[in-house]
């Protein structure tokens, strides 16, 4: 690390959520800096934020006040497909119809809300159906990544004659 930059006061992160180990390394290196994580999409802009991990470590942060969340097709655990409305949505794709401010943006994520915090469970195309039950690989991956000695984890689905699919764990 270039020690000339240790005087940073604010570090912003967006895109993928910082892993617990990376967040810890950043916090230890830049002890006086505020670490602000944003979650959003290109189409819907910012959806949630987490300042210095004040929100639950498993969430992507607190939902911005100007954001309206809709969860479509909720299951018994209140997990549903995340749809978003806010005043910062994009205007549309080139050569396609204009997107109006009241339009719901479909993120393609399965999520749930607890205490005004947004929790991502899985991408829509990553959900596994094992023995007619929804299984979200990200949930398993996050649990495994929090175990001592595990750096990375990935769960993939494999066809299975009895259950339809099974989860296969790969880790380092």
Give the ranges of each region predicted by the language model.
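Gly/Ser/Thr-rich phosphate-binding loop
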Residues: 2-56, 68
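A structural signal for short hydrophobic beta-strand segments in well-ordered beta-sheet cores
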Residues: 57, 69-72, 109-113, 155
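Conserved ATP/PPi-binding loop(s) of AMP-dependent carboxylate-activating enzymes
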Residues: 62-66, 74-102, 133-135
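AMP-binding/adenylate-forming catalytic core of the ANL superfamily
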Residues: 40, 80, 86, 92, ...
């Amino acid at each position: 690390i270039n020690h000339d930059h240790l005087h940073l006061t604010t570090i912003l992160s967006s895109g993928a959520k910082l892993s617990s180990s990376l967040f810890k390394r950043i916090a230890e290196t830049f002890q006086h800096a505020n670490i602000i994580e944003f979650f959003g999409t290109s189409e819907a802009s910012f959806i949630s934020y987490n300042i210095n991990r004040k929100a639950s470590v498993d969430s992507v942060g607190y939902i911005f006040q100007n954001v309206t969340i809709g969860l479509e097709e909720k299951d018994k655990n209140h997990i549903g497909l995340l749809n978003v409305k806010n005043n910062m949505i994009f205007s549309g794709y080139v050569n396609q119809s204009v997107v109006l401010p009241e339009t719901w943006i479909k993120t393609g994520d399965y999520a749930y809300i607890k205490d005004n915090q947004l929790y991502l469970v899985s991408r829509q195309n990553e959900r596994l159906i094992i023995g007619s039950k929804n299984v979200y690989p990200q949930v398993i991956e996050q649990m495994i990544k929090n175990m001592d000695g595990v750096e990375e984890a990935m769960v993939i689905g494999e066809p299975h004659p009895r259950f339809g699919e099974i989860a296969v764990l790969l880790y380092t």
